[in-house]
Amino acid sequence: MPNGTPTLNRPLARLALRITSCAHQGLERLIRLLHLLLHLGRSLLDLFQTLRTALTQPSTSIFSLTRLPLLLPPLRLLLLLLLPSPPRQPALASRLTQPNRPNRGRLAK
């Protein structure tokens, strides 16, 4: 122990790195989800305002060319939420712990 500082053994350091990496990925996913929910909320608000305007002003049609672009983003977000998501890749930790996997570049030991 140089300078009296304790050193971590390699397996413990690797485990700490994996835990930190998984926590970082989880935080990134949470931020992306919150970002999507924020956009969905804004889009739904735009959709309801457009519908209210169309219903309160009979001279403007909801399907007019000026109103249609306002409806597309919320409808797209609703479709993304309703359609099934593509299959997910296995987690990084499970790929690192399976010894009989082929060489995966930087993940290989």
Swiss-Prot record:
What are the annotated GO cellular component locations? host cell cytoplasm
Where does the record place it?
Answer: Host cytoplasm
Q: Cite the residue spans of the region called Disordered.
A: 89-109
UniProt KW keywords: Host cytoplasm, Host-virus interaction, Phosphoprotein
Name of this protein: Avian agnoprotein 2b
Natural source organism: Budgerigar fledgling disease virus
